[in-house]
Every structure is written in C-alpha cells, then in structure tokens.
C-alpha cells in the first residue's frame, strides 16, 4: 500500500516526528520517537518519483544495511508497523539514531576552522578505517565517503563515528555516476571522474581526503576550485604530493607535507604524511600501498600510528610541549635522560607530575605516563618541574605569528579578497584559541602542583601528628619518672639512718634525674609545631587565592568574538567583496595582552606553591630526626626506669633479709632483728571480729570459715619469718652482692 510522504510533525500511531535530520538526492531522513517507550529511530523515506534504476538502488541499500553489523557502520532496524508502507513505490528504511549529528556539522564549527584536535583526528581514523575494512571484507565499496555520510554517537563517554548512506554501493550503475554525485564530487577518486574501472581503492582516496580536511580544515587539492577544474591540474602531481594550493600569482604549488597550522604533534605529523601519501596516490593500482601480510599497507600503517605510545610533557619552566615516542618496556630513567637532552633539566632535578598531582614511580616503566585508550596530546599531559627552582619567571614569549597573520598585524587596514581573508581569519581564530589553550594547559600544570603540595601537606600533617603524639607520651613518662624518682630519693633519705645506704646507688639515681632533664629537651617541639602551623595557614591562603582558580574569562570572551567575526565573514560572497582586518587585529592584540597578564599571575602563584612545597621538603627530615630523637629518649628513659625498679626490688629483698637482724640492735645493720612472730590478730582480736560479725547477723558457718582461714595465713607467715631468720644467720649485709648497681 502506498501513502504520501510523511510531513513534519506528523504522527504514525505511537510514533511522533521530532526533527528532520537530513535531505539527500532522493530522500529525507527524519527522527521519530515512540510516545509510549521513548525509543528513537531515524526513518529514511523517498521524497521523489524514482526511475526503475533508482528504485533498485533504494531497495539495494535496504538489503545491504540489513545484513551489516559493525560498531562503525550505522545499523538498520525494523520499520515500525505503522510506517510499513510504500512511499513513491519504495519502502522506508529504519536506522539507529545517532544524536551527535554528522561530521560536516562538526567541521563547520568556527573552532575547527583549522582542523580538529589530535584526539578527534585519531579517533576518526580508527573508527572510519575499521568501518571501511569491514565493508570491503563484505565485498562492498561505499564510493561516497564524505563528512556528510559520517555520523557521531556518544557511547560510554566516547565519540563513535559511523558510516551511513550506502545508496551508491558497488553494484550501482556506473554510467550515471557523474550526474548522481552532483554536489559531492570533491571527495571522489579520479577514476570515477574518468569513468574507468575501479576497485576498493576509490574509498581510500575519499578516506584520505576526508582525514586531510579534518586535520587542516580544508580539502587537500585546490579546495576553492570546482572539481572538474582541479582534476586537470592535480593529475600531474607526484605520488608523494598530498597538498596543492594556488599562489597569489595563480601558480599551483604542490607539497608532500601537511599545511600549518594544525593540531597534531610532530611525531604524528610525520607518520600521517607518509600514510596520506599512500591514500592520495593518483594511480588507483598503487593507491593504498599494496598488500602487507594479507592486508592493504595503508591499514597496517594506520594501525601502527594508532598504536604509538607517545608521552606529551609540558615543561613548566618554559611552557613548551615535548613529545616522546616510547619504546616497548622503556624505563622511566631512559625517558628522563631523553628529557634532559631536550630541556637541559638534569634527571635528578626533574619532577614529573600527572594531572592529579601524583609523581611518577621510578620503579615502573615509562608507559605509566600514557593512559590506555586515550590518544592525542590534547587529552592528557605530564607536567615537568625543575626541583632546583622555586621561582618561575614567566610569562614566556607568546606563539609566533604566521606569515599571513604578521601581514595583517603590520597593516590591519589592508583590503583583501574574501577567500584570502577567510584563510587569514581562520588562522587568527586558531591563534587566539591557541593562546587560550596554552594558558589552560599551564593552569592545569599549576593545579597539578597544588595537588602535589596538598599531598605533601597531608604527609606533613601525619608526621606532625606522630611527632606530637610521641612528644606527649615522652612528656607524660618524664613527668612520671621525675615524680617517682623524687619520692624514691626522699624515702631513701628517710631510711638511711636505720636502714640501707649506698653512695654508688644514690649517685646513679641522681645521674638518672639529670639525664631525664636532657631527655626532656628532645620532646621540645614548639618551634617545629609553630612552623608547621604557619605552613598550614600559608597553604590555606594559597587555596583561597583568586589565582588558584581559572583567570581566562577575558581570553575566552575574545575567542568567542574572533569566532563571531569569522562566522560573519564566511557567508559573504567571494566575488564582490573586499575587507580589512582591523577588528580581528584588535582581538589578536588584546588576547596577547590578556595572556601576558594572566600568566604573570599564574607564575607568581606557582612560585609561591613551589616555595611552600620546598619548605615542607626541608621540614620533613627535621621532623623525622625529632621523632627519632624522641623515640631514643623514650627508650632510654624506659631503660632507666626499669633499672631503678630492679634496684628497688633488690633493696626490698635486702630489707626483708635485714629485718630479722634488727633484734640485735637498732644501730647495727648486720645484727638480725627478731620480729614478732604474731603478725596477725591475737585471741582478743578474733573475739572482736566474732562479735562484729555476729552483730551483723552473719551465719556461723561463714564466721568459722573466716577464722580458720585467718589461722592458716598466720601459720604461713610465721613459717616464712622463721625461714628468713635462718637465712640471716648464714649471711651478713656486708657479704651481699651489689654488682647490680653497675648494670
């Protein structure tokens, strides 16, 4: 059953049309949403009456789409029953919806006028290269690869590129090709222009053209000319030429190198230039480089590029970025030696920080600098600091102006034709954006330094707490030791007249008292504590400082103004207008001045951070030494306490043995003293106890048990005293061993 094309805002059962996503040669692609489930689908419907050939082409696309399943080729899905009808004698095609729009939309953004970022280029190469290989394995040649036929979808935080529009796949009529491809000829391989036999290498040409445009912001070969015009001029190029441009004189120039400016690091530039030479070879047989291990050489080289491990290091002392291709299992020390060669910073003075302020681990390989699955120097950076410096003198010299930018800065009122002005202003936008990004990277480096400082501060706080705790414990033990030795000395003096005396022991105890005073000095941490508290306050102030937050608002505003100027220029007719660059030059000058101001503040703040960190580094060994001294004092104090306690117990033993000698006379320490044998209550005491317990209504059994137990203890004590008396008869005080005083 056939129905008219669906109009905007139309309803098909539970499906509402939400948006028109695109219009092709014969069809419209519209977005539909299911009101009940929220499901989204892209529905392609025919908008014109088609010839029999084109009807076959339409149906063939549907059949091809239904048998493909690859993450980088858009998937076909079931047409909702409510839309399962014919429009202009052909069915609808339902596809997954990709919310990121197409690649053309991304390239048209002013910020991408000089190409995409490195991470975006590498991601695109990986996705589209994988999709093309899959199609070729399925014996499908796309033949119409272009930015409009690449859509973007966010998946788990990553942008995924998908190939769409297989309406001109391999089996399409070759004779009608030129008329069918009106408007997209800029990406077609030369043999398709010439109506010659072709192979999968036509997709290589389109792929290379598209990647070049993503890198430079424009197509590689005379992009301002019509396809049929540049075709005749470019066919003379050498197989290594990947770029052609027209001089002011009208002369055509060829180059084997990517144009500047672009956003690729030098290591990637060299590799991609070689890769593009394979893809943009005019000869379809040589294009792609032949087979290598069963695969086209261009895809082998592409994989090598994508698998490169490159570490990007921002030297915070010079604001320059250094990129290093890491070798397998390269050690961090080897990388640091290479860094020393390029920067002049010795390996012992290098501090390499990740974005979160974590220092690189010297025990791990250099690959710890690279994040798995993350490509491009715009995505991650390692920050290099010189530990021998605490004052960074920035700002540094701004980016150098290109020849054409320098031309308009020298004379901002010079009139230029619109096509030339577009190129110059595109470079101006790129320059302004570059200055802003330079600041952003340096700010991120400052932030890494702040996070590193906070890590050091956390370590400082832990060590301080350990020191304070150890000091407090030592103080408490000293207080106990001093008080106990004072009491011991007092009691010793009290009993000297009738008890035991030893000058050697007394001298040893007084020496202990003096040593305890010295040990107390080890626990004096007041100065260190105050210094640490001052550092904590300084760090809090640095965190509160406006310089700790981004100061690039003015530069971002100037970047937006530059983009607006470029957007206003773009739609103007190139044939009728000339214009000067007064406004754009003003923005350039203001951006340079703005960067100079914010970088002065940034490096002033950074110097304070690094100075504060150096103070912590200098303090840590002092704290460690203080803690060790406290521990040593604590240990020595405990040893003295233990020694004195052993002496006291020895004295107690002597006192016990001497007690029996006192019966011979109070003045003689050698005469045994006969103690009272009855050290426990006598009979009258027992009666008093019995009376007291009876008064309290205690049972007779408990009373009898208590009295019996008392008698047992009395007999035991009497036995011990008799034993002591016997021992004293065999020993005198003068024969006792006092060698323990020397221990």
UniProtKB/Swiss-Prot annotation:
InterPro entries membership: IKBKB_SDD (IPR041185), IKBKB_SDD_sf (IPR046375), IKK (IPR051180), Kinase-like_dom_sf (IPR011009), Prot_kinase_dom (IPR000719), Ser/Thr_kinase_AS (IPR008271)
One Pfam family, short name: IKBKB_SDD
EC number(s) given by UniProt: 2.7.11.10
The keyword Coiled coil is assigned to this record: no
EC class (word): transferase
Activity regulation: Activated when phosphorylated and inactivated when dephosphorylated.
Subcellular location: Cytoplasm; Nucleus
GO cellular component: cytoplasm; nucleus
Catalytic activity: L-seryl-[I-kappa-B protein] + ATP = O-phospho-L-seryl-[I-kappa-B protein] + ADP + H(+)
KW Cell inner membrane (keyword) present: no
Residues reported in the UniProt entry to bind ATP: 21-29, 44
Residue span of region NEMO-binding: 736-741
Family under the similarity heading: Belongs to the protein kinase superfamily. Ser/Thr protein kinase family. I-kappa-B kinase subfamily.
Protein name from the UniProt record: Inhibitor of nuclear factor kappa-B kinase subunit alpha
